[in-house]
Swiss-Prot record:
One Gene Ontology term, aspect cellular component: male germ cell nucleus
GO biological process: maintenance of protein location in nucleus; mRNA transcription by RNA polymerase II; negative regulation of signal transduction by p53 class mediator; negative regulation of transcription by RNA polymerase II; positive regulation of transcription initiation by RNA polymerase II; regulation of transcription by RNA polymerase II; RNA polymerase II preinitiation complex assembly; transcription by RNA polymerase II
Protein's UniProt name: Transcription initiation factor TFIID subunit 3
Family according to the record: Belongs to the TAF3 family.
């Protein structure tokens, strides 16, 4: 009543405005369109005002909110003011009652002298109504049938439904003739109440499940167009009360109702919906059973919806001339029983279930429908989950895209949705593309212009078309002989773009819906499915966790096995160097890589061993300790071997004998002196002792004692060798010193004393061996000035080289490969070559030559000072901390080698080049050892 009344008033207003502008007459089609536009315009204006008032924290809008709403709609307030002043005011044709309209007091507050007032407890405030008596409760229970707040209230007796359908068919046809001009919205306007029906329709069930909507009536009661036929009016009267049940619930009931009829005759199922689609569509083919979206105008199929709402059993749906057949089946409509199940609470439950599991959608279908749905569910439940989610995402995305506010674009679909602005163009494009499927889905989402709405028409349980479904539909169409896809003929004159093509036939959807089980069964099944899904997920999680645990266990087992193997190998090896030869993985990095590879292989194999792990954990710890000790021992032994070899090589070359005065001087020049002759043998032993002290577990003291004894023996042997070598060196030195004294006396007599070397004196550098060493020939200052203090400690910043030192020669490695093997690099030690050159230079009366073997990265400046160059950055020593390689004696800046803090003194450090060479040498040794 409200819709028809408001629309009639708007029509009068349109006529008055036209008269004021000078028009004498108006075509009915134009009048209907203008009325529809005015209605939408006022609705959007009201929405804008309300939203602005809420935005600023007000419950009631004020003029400022109205002004903001006008601006949002593109209306200039100044122009509007001028228009009002320049045009005579149009009086309203009817007197409008002042709101709120006076009503009888239904609260029944007790009068002061009544019994209720006397019996009323003191603690009950006066503003609370009295407790309802049992009689009143009984009366109230009867009210819902009239109120239509629940699905039951909306239902009509089956007998009436049959009659209603016949009447509706007639009315629709008549209506087409009578009001071809009604804009789709006019029919759609009832969508306020009908949107629920649409959603409830089997076709729209999926959509409904996907997105919950508020009934259009609750949003815009005025929006629905006046009832076109008496039957519809009655339906509206029934539907008018539709309480704000969750839109989802109502749609389910609706869907079930239409399904009940199709159950009896699947071929007719489309009929119910075809009528709703449009008068043209209704006549065309019940087979086309347009999805609720199709029903009514493309934007919204409100007419169809209200029709369906009129008969919850859907008996009323006169969607096609064949609807009388449906009427025959109407008595079957067990839809009513379903509708009672859809009380607000039940509907809410269904709504939640549907949201969680789209397959459950048909919960509210009638028993017959339930059966059909039961058949259909096993096929489509899986598909629906994914497809529904995808469709929902698509719908949401499209809705977001379409929600750009455009004050001038109006769409009934958007109004039903509650979207203030949606352009008709959008509606026409998307809705036409998805023939009215979006309209059916409008109850849930305006943007349901995606293929989902269409699919919803085809099957509520299926959101996506399958090959089988499409084939079945084609066959059905052929049997029915009615083109389901015939374009609907719209008598309405609405925006031409809005008239949508008829959607694909809903036959399959109806059949599937009919197959759906009863709401109770469906709920149970849904709950079971949810539980099973949750259980499956939990099982999967547990499995994944177990797999991860197994992987970790397998890794630990692999590590344990490797450690055990290493222990066994260590026990079998009598000599440490053999152990080194056999261990290809002496490099800790390589060892780690192997562990990971083994672990990867073992992950697949090992799944047991929880008990073993606990036992092996302790073993692992012990093995790790033993490993580290073994590796350290191996390294130390290698170093000792290399040192011994170097010493042997160094010993044979003859050394110059220094005079007794200079006996205290080190054998090597300060640049080359990193470690005194006695130190190389002992230096490697220090780290061993330190590491041993740190890692001594009580259990392994015995093993350590044995190792220490072996080490002591080796040390003693080395000491003896060194002492012998020293004695030889001393003898040679004495001989050389004697010769040097003779030469020096001659030089002193001939040469004047030179206070400092002149920068002009040329220097010669000769490369020796593999380019590691250079022979630097420079001028020598007289002996008296040469008494520099020997520097035994390696400086972090290389020390300046003292210039005046008599000719000194010390052994250097004979073969460049040995340099890489040596634990202590002899690279900076003077080479034997200088001895000869020194002797030869003694003959020269003026100058003597000092030869020193200097690293390629050490330079002497004009005054003879040594400057270290970092091989990493090729920049000289700038005072920043540097670290020297224990093999080649090249000095690197810390940042160039990635060192942040100084390493411990006991620990040897090798540059990248030397480290690689040592690794290669170790491998080579191992190969040789194996060959033997």
């Amino acid at each position: 009543m409200c819709e028809s009344y408001s629309r009639s008033l708007l029509r009068v207003s349109v006529a008055q405005i036209c008269q004021a502008l000078g028009w004498d007459s108006v075509q009915l089609s134009a009048c209907h369109l203008l009325t529809d536009v005015l209605q939408r315009y006022l609705q959007q204006l009201g929405r804008g005002c309300h939203r602005y008032s809420e935005l600023y924290g007000r419950t009631d809008p004020i003029l400022d909110d109205v002004g903001e709403a006008f601006q949002l709609m593109g209306v200039n307030l100044h122009e509007l003011e001028d228009y009002i002043h320049n045009i005579e005011p149009v009086t309203f044709p009817h007197q409008i009652p002042s709101f709120p309209v006076s009503k009888n007091n239904v609260l029944q507050f007790p009068q002061p002298g009544s019994k209720d007032a006397e019996e009323r407890k003191d603690y009950i405030p006066d503003y609370l109504p009295p407790i309802v008596s049992s009689q009143e409760e009984e009366e109230e229970e009867q009210v819902p049938t009239d109120g239509g707040t629940s699905a039951e209230a909306m239902q009509v007796p089956l007998e009436e439904d049959d009659e209603m359908e016949e009447e509706e068919v007639i009315n629709d046809e008549n209506f087409l003739g009578k009001r071809p001009l009604d804009s789709p919205e006019v029919e759609e306007m009832p969508s306020m109440k009908r949107p629920r029906l649409l959603s409830t329709k089997g076709d729209s069930l999926d959509v409904v499940l996907l997105e919950a909507r508020e009934p259009l009536s609750s949003i815009n009661p005025q929006k629905t167009p006046p009832v076109l036929s008496p039957v519809r009016v009655q339906d509206r009267a029934d539907l008018a009360p539709p309480s704000p049940q969750p839109p989802m619930l109502a749609p389910f009931a609706k869907s079930q109702l239409p399904i009940a009829k199709p159950l009896e005759t699947k071929s007719f199922t489309p009929k119910t919906k075809t009528k709703a689609s449009s008068p043209g569509q209704k006549t065309k083919s019940p087979k086309a059973a347009l999805s609720p979206a199709r029903l009514g105008s493309p934007i919204r199929s409100p007419k169809t919806i209200p029709k369906e709402k009129k008969s919850p059993g859907r008996s009323k749906s006169p969607k096609s001339p064949k609807s009388p057949k449906i009427v025959a089946h109407v008595p079957q409509t067990p839809v009513r029983p379903e509708t009672p199940n859809r009380t607000p609470s039940a509907m809410v439950v269904e709504k939640t279930v549907k949201e969680t599991i789209p397959v459950m959608k048909p919960t509210q279908t009638p028993p017959e429908v339930v059966k059909l749905n039961i058949e259909m569910q096993p096929k489509k439940p899986v598909v629906t989950d994914k497809t529904i989610d995808d469709s929902i995402d698509a719908v949401i995305a499209r809705a977001c895209a379409e929600r750009e506010p455009d004050p001038f674009e109006f769409s009934s679909g958007s109004e039903s949705e509650g979207d203030t602005f949606t352009s008709p163009k959008r509606i026409s494009g998307s809705e036409c593309a998805t023939p009215k499927a979006s309209t059916s889905s409008n109850n849930f989402t305006k943007s349901l212009a995606t293929p989902l709405p269409l699919s919803s028409g085809t099957s509520s349980s299926d959101n996506s078309w399958t090959m089988d479904a499409s084939i079945d539909e084609v066959v059905r169409k052929a049997k029915l002989g009615a083109p389901s896809n015939m374009p609907p003929t719209f008598p309405y004159i609405s925006s031409p773009s809005i008239s949508p093509p008829t959607p694909e036939p809903l036959h399959k959807g109806y059949e599937e819906k009919a197959k759906l089980p009863s709401s109770v069964d469906v709920k149970k099944k849904l709950k079971k499915e949810l539980k099973t899904k949750l259980k499956k997920k939990e099982k999967q999680r547990d499995r994944e966790r177990e797999r991860e645990r197994n992987k970790e266990r397998s890794k630990e087992k692999d590590k344990m096995r490797e450690r055990e193997k290493e222990k066994e190998a260590g026990k079998e090896l009598k000599y440490p160097w053999r152990e080194l030869m056999k261990d290809e993985d002496s490099d800790p990095y390589k060892f780690k890589i192997k562990e990971f590879e083994d672990i990867d292989a073992a992950k697949v194999r090992l799944k047991d061993g929880i008990v073993r792990r606990e036992r092996e954990k302790h073993k692992d710890k012990k093995k790790d300790r033993e490993r580290s000790k073994r590796e350290k021992d191996k390294r130390e032994r290698e170093r000792l071997k290399e040192k011994n070899r170097e010493d042997k090589i160094k010993a044979p070359p003859t050394q110059l004998v220094l005079p007794p005065k200079e006996m205290a001087l080190p054998l090597f020049s300060p640049s080359a002196v990193r470690v005194p002759a006695m130190l190389p043998a002992f230096s490697p032993m220090l780290p061993e002792k330190l590491f041993e002290e740190k890692e001594k577990p009580k259990e392994k003291e015995r093993k350590k004692d044995k190792k220490e004894k072996k080490k002591k023996k080796e040390k003693e042997k080395e000491k003896e060798k060194k002492e012998r070598e020293r004695e030889k060196e001393r003898r040679e030195r004495e001989k050389r010193e004697k010769e040097k004294e003779k030469h020096k006396h001659e030089k002193i007599k001939v040469e004047p004393v030179i206070p400092a070397p002149s920068p002009v004196i040329p220097r010669l550098t000769l490369r020796v061996g593999a380019g590691q060493d250079k022979i630097v020939i420079s001028k020598v200052v007289p002996a008296p000035e040469a008494k520099p203090a020997p520097s035994l400690n390696r400086p972090k910043t290389p020390p300046p080289a003292p210039v005046p030192i008599p000719v000194r020669v010390s052994p250097t490695p004979l073969q460049p490969p040995l340099l890489t093997q040596a634990a202590v690099c002899p690279a900076l030690m003077p080479s034997p070559a200088p001895a000869l050159s020194g002797i030869g230079s003694a003959k020269a009366p003026v100058r003597s030559v000092v030869t020193e073997t200097v690293s390629t990265y050490v330079i002497r400046d004009e005054w003879g000072n040594q400057i270290w160059i970092c091989p990493g950055c090729n920049k000289p020593d700038d005072g920043s901390p540097m670290i020297g390689c224990d093999d080649c004696d090249d000095w690197y800046h810390w940042p160039c080698v990635g060192i942040m803090a100084a390493p411990p003194e006991e620990m040897q450090w090798f540059c990248p080049k030397c480290a690689n060479k040592i690794k290669k040498d170790k491998k080579h040794k191992k190969r040789k050892h194996r060959a033997h």
